[in-house]
Amino acid sequence: MLRTPLWATASLLAAAISLAGCGEDKAPAEQAAAPQTQSEPAASAPDTLNSEAAQAVVKHYADMAHAIFSDAHGTALKLQEAIDALIAEPTDATLQAAKEAWLAARVPYMQTEVFRFGNPVVDDWEGQLNAWPLDEGLIDYVEGDYQHALGNPGATANIIANQEVQIGEDKIDVSQITGELLASLNELAGSEANVATGYHAIEFLLWGQDLNGTNPGAGQRPVSDFIDGEGCTGGNCDRRRTYLKVATDLLVSDLEEMVGQWEAGVAGNYRASLEAESAENGLRKMFFGMGSLSLGELAGERMKVALEANSTEDEHDCFSDNTHNSHFFNAKGIRNIYLGEYLRTDGSTLTGPSLASLVEGVSPEIDSDLKTNLETTEAKMQVLVASANDGEAFDQLIAPDNSEGQEKVRAAIAALVAQTASIEQAAAALGIKDLNPDTADHEF
């Protein structure tokens, strides 16, 4: 069913701002019916889109994808080096260095996610790298009262502690921890909470469970969990070290594969097929990626779900308490695409033909509105970052008794919803109608 464009509903922001936490039962908040309003007409689309200019924008989009995935791969290589150092000599210093490398690796990766929606090669590949939330008992030891997905037979499988795991009537040999084995265990028994690979599996192995709930503090895994021989805590330190090494190597390999998909001048890769399509199709993918990440994924899955359920289990980087940064750089990725700009990890800035230049040529007002909304979203995300830097992380903001903190999250969600409305208007201005960004079944 086609969804009414967001910009046509005058009550949009009021509905978003009225979001409220729902307590521990995780029931969705009741949504007030939006009053019927007169739809505002979209700006007249150009009779013919300048194909050459549009194709240049699509080409630069591919250049940006290659650059950002390359930076994600480069920071993953540094993470790999840090984890190798931790395994070689487990100390508080090498564990801290590995954590810092993981945090640095999240910065470019989160800016890649805007390419996920509209580009099947990214969406089909992404789950092995960034699936969440995960039932960490699949991987390693957990507290006996840890919360996990109901009915998940793998929730306490503990691959690290066992040579085989029992799932229903099936026994799975996990004696040799390899990348192929771990990849095969993702969504084990049909449960999306069974995540054996990617950034969040590595995050859990570095930080351990965050047992603080909505109180201050992240996970506190002791470095002794990685000691070989005498002094090992948590048991099975050799297998924990192997798991961490294998998961990291797989992450690096997966990112290298995606860099290749966006390499220029390679016959048969995804970039070649994208550039062979019409420029209009390319622009649609760009706008759809921006709108879907903005609305269904970031505002919905990553923020609204956690807020409404007051659920620390549903925050994105839950073991490290890095959620504020992941949200900020998701939003930054959306802005990158519209402006055609990306600040690389080496400090250089990649610029080129942009959607903004195309929209400005048709409707300076719509272009200005979207730029304003992008700036507003970034400012609201910066509030979350500043809060975490001041000692109040995302999981504390969504606590049931923290009305002031919840309001900060609601304001960011409202900004994302308004931003998505402007994205739809900008697309329509270029003749791209019925964009219908993915809502992930959320109502705003």
Residue map of PLM features:
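Bacterial N-terminal signal peptides that target proteins for export
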Residues: 1-10
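Bacterial signal peptide processing site
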Residues: 22-26
